[in-house]
Amino acid sequence: MTNFTFDGAHSSLEFQIKHLMVSKVKGSFDQFDVAVEGDINDFSTLKATATIIPSSINTKNEARDNHLKSGDFFGTDEFDKITFVTKSVSESKVVGDLTIKGITNEETFDVEFNGVSKNPMDGSQVTGVIVTGTINRENYGINFNQALETGGVMLGKDVKFEASAEFSISE
């Protein structure tokens, strides 16, 4: 069994969504945690739970962030966390239940496992993964949108994300 300690200072969770049919808006969740258990040498034994604090959303625009925290989007007064609980893990895919605003759907995401390294600062063993994927926000009750005079809508329904997580590990 491998002991995993999440390193939030060396991890990130970023997303992007199409805006006005012509560009992308990017942002991040600044507070999240990932708990992992299992044997790093046997991916089939790995189980993980990611917990994201949606009120930590950061798009570098306070007014937009406040709107994203409202009931039009994440409803952070009522729904204080987003969770992803794995069902299966391989070296290239992770399948699990994603819950946003109390709505749970099974999702499959891509995984890039980056091996194990020794941290020269303290001698600890570290590992990292990058998880990428796309979710349809409307599947989670995030339906806010506005029609554009030129056709199309203000916001795309697909949200792309990249989560980079680093862990100290020990046996």
UniProtKB/Swiss-Prot annotation:
Pfam families per the UniProt record, alphabetical: YceI
PANTHER family recorded: PROTEIN YCEI
Similarity comment: family membership: Belongs to the UPF0312 family.
Protein name (Swiss-Prot/TrEMBL): UPF0312 protein SAS2572
Organism encoding this protein: Staphylococcus aureus (strain MSSA476)
